[in-house]
């Protein structure tokens, strides 16, 4: 009797299907990386600037400061759709000129440098002013940069963030629930916070709060129908900021003497265990966000030129971020605040210039 041939029920994928699955997995990792970056940068500015300087008014100033970034993201999505480009950089190439695509990449690099310097300053202040370690700020900045460079793997960092997304989310929800148990509606008064003049000044200085949203325009389109994009980190940021406002009276929120006090003051009302977890999570989040700035900045530098080995770019970018730390944290914070109101102006000009080119590109394709 002839034996039946061996049969397998394992599904055999083609090479193209396997490649598509890998690309989708890499895209999900990059999306998780951007979501963490967006949340950490927004909550850092929200606590250290909005809540510390205007108190209860931060509950409505936060969404207002996100609007310019959201508008530019919508404009970028429109240009991508008109040019049928997978990323905004490709939309610049198709709608205008490859040279302007390089200008857009250079603009993104400068934004990442500014944010990286801001995150590095936050980390240094957190250790030297908050935890009170007997280390000079410059050496603390050097140690922080070395730790961030150890995390800067081209594909390893996004995958690490993807693996940590649920533990970090659980931690954030735990802290949010703890803050909400201390919430009091009376702390919403006065809703104008420190006054209209302070609120107007804060809006003008924090109008670039949502600039990391522009990075989502560089994500290639996914296969899923329901793409939430930056919505989850923005919702979580607004919930955390609202919970901090409801847990702190305006008079107490505005007593922060330095950056570390402003970042750590909302943790005072947490339980001791949650306070420790919040401090650890805060440091991990800032370190990962700094590493993301370094990794993405290096990727843009390599994209502007020939694909040389990445380590010289990492070293050069680290030196670029470390050099301003010699000026002192207070002077550096003042310089960063002077630049912040103008961060979105070049991006808005470039996107407005792209719109007519994108419309012409669509007409050429439909003709």
What label would you give each PLM region?
Residues 3-89, 217-221, 231, 255-263:
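Transmembrane helix-boundary motif of multi-pass solute transporters/channels
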Residues 26-51, 64-68, 108-112, 140, ...:
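Hydrophobic, membrane-embedded alpha-helices of multi-pass small-molecule transporters
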Residues 30, 116-120, 167-193, 351-366:
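Hydrophobic alpha-helical segments and their helix-loop junctions in multi-pass secondary transporters
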Residues 64-77, 109-119, 144-150, 166-180, ...:
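Selective recognition of specific alpha-helical transmembrane segments in multi-pass small-molecule
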Residues 125-128, 144-164, 219-224, 331-335:
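Membrane-water interface regions at transmembrane-helix termini and the short interhelical loops
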Residues 247-275:
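Membrane-interface interhelical connector segments
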